[in-house]
């Protein structure tokens, strides 16, 4: 399959009129679309406080969730986002679908399109899977990348940026540090692109040499292999999960060694600016990349990220469907 995933060709995210039709990566997104998503998400936040938590924005539309990897937060919030927009939702259990019998991804999509599906949310272990589907469908249905291999996770980056903007102040005044397993992280790459477009003055990446790709410096980020030096002057800390399921054994001596050098503890949090926000995309490895005292502490905004993720994903679906315009 990977030989067909030429996801570097062109920008499939925009239609012929220059409108955002698919969300595949934060790379290649213009500032105006990023701001449109963030501002629309702000308007959708209030729905959670209503007695009837729905808006008719996508009434009559059908959204299919295809998750080829395990997920709790992303899958749940996409399902709830579509339902709160009044869409019909198909949750495809890939382990019991024809895909488990060898059916190709595009054949699966074609069969669902025959049922008049209007949009697809796709998580897949191979980088470029969502791009393959978007190229296959063109403008006939919207596609949202919910994570593809180590490549991208755009909605996670958008909800992180939304959280920073809402709780931490203007992004153009914040110094942001991304700490941990950057090598395997699709989230980090997506965060870097989004923060850069929105004018973040300094993005730092902190981690052991084996878990920080050398080519990141080409994106304009500052790379640190010492946690104390990297956290000095930082306003926002994004801690990343150690992705042991993707990791080759030689990249990490031990979990204890990682925590000793790069784990975020209350004492180390003091190296950053007073009141620095702490984010984590989840799921957390408590006692490895983040101590429970920090994860549950006053500076952590991890549960707020989850709540914001629902509003951001509602905004993405509404905008891609051409139906944004009010909650």
UniProtKB/Swiss-Prot annotation:
Q: Organism, per UniProt?
A: Acidithiobacillus ferrooxidans (strain ATCC 23270 / DSM 14882 / CIP 104768 / NCIMB 8455)
Listed HAMAP family: Asp_carb_tr (MF_00001)
Cellular component terms (Gene Ontology): cytosol
What the entry lists under PANTHER family is as follows:
ASPARTATE CARBAMOYLTRANSFERASE (PTHR45753:SF6), ORNITHINE CARBAMOYLTRANSFERASE, MITOCHONDRIAL (PTHR45753)
What is the similarity comment for this entry?
Belongs to the aspartate/ornithine carbamoyltransferase superfamily. ATCase family.
Q: What does this protein do, in the record's words?
A: Catalyzes the condensation of carbamoyl phosphate and aspartate to form carbamoyl aspartate and inorganic phosphate, the committed step in the de novo pyrimidine nucleotide biosynthesis pathway.
Name assigned to this protein: Aspartate carbamoyltransferase catalytic subunit
- The answer to whether keyword Ligase applies is no
Mind telling me which Pfam families this protein's record contains? OTCace, OTCace_N
In Gene Ontology terms, what is a biological process of this protein?
A: amino acid metabolic process
Annotated binding of carbamoyl phosphate, by residue: 73-74, 123, 153, 156, 282-283
Q: What are the protein's UniProt keywords?
A: Pyrimidine biosynthesis, Transferase
What reaction does this enzyme carry out catalytically? Answer: carbamoyl phosphate + L-aspartate = N-carbamoyl-L-aspartate + phosphate + H(+)
Look at the named UniProt entry and state the broad enzyme category this protein falls under: transferase
Q: Which residues bind L-aspartate?
A: 101, 186, 241
């Amino acid at each position: 399959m990977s030989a067909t995933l030429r996801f570097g060709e062109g920008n499939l995210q925009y239609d012929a009129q220059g409108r955002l039709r698919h969300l595949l990566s934060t790379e290649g997104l213009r500032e105006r679309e990023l701001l449109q998503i963030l501002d629309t998400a702000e308007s959708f936040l209030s729905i959670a406080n209503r007695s009837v938590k729905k808006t008719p924005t996508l009434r009559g539309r059908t959204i299919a969730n295809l998750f080829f990897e395990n997920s709790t937060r992303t899958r749940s919030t996409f399902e709830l986002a579509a339902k709160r927009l009044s869409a019909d939702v198909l949750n495809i259990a890939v382990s019991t679908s024809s895909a488990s019998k060898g059916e190709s991804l595009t054949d699966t999509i074609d069969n669902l399109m025959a049922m008049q599906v209007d949009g697809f949310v796709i998580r897949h272990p191979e980088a470029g899977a969502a791009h393959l589907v978007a190229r296959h469908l063109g403008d006939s249905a919207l596609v949202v990348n919910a994570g593809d291999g180590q490549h991208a996770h755009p909605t996670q980056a958008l909800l992180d940026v939304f959280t920073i903007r809402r709780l931490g102040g203007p992004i153009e005044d914040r110094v942001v540090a991304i700490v941990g397993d950057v090598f395997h992280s699709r989230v980090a790459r997506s965060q870097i692109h989004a923060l850069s477009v929105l004018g973040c003055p300094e993005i730092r990446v902190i981690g052991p040499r084996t878990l920080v790709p050398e080519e990141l410096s080409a994106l304009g980020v500052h790379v640190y292999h010492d946690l104390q030096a990297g956290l000095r002057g930082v306003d926002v800390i994004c801690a990343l999960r150690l992705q042991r399921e993707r990791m080759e054994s030689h990249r990490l001596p031990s979990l204890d060694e990682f925590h000793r050098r790069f784990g975020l503890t209350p004492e180390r949090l003091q190296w950053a600016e007073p009141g620095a926000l702490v984010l984590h995309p989840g799921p957390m490895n408590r006692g490895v990349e983040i101590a429970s005292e920090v994860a549950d502490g006053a500076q952590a905004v991890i549960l707020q990220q989850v709540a914001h993720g629902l509003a951001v994903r509602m905004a993405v679906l509404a905008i891609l469907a051409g139906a944004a315009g009010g909650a």
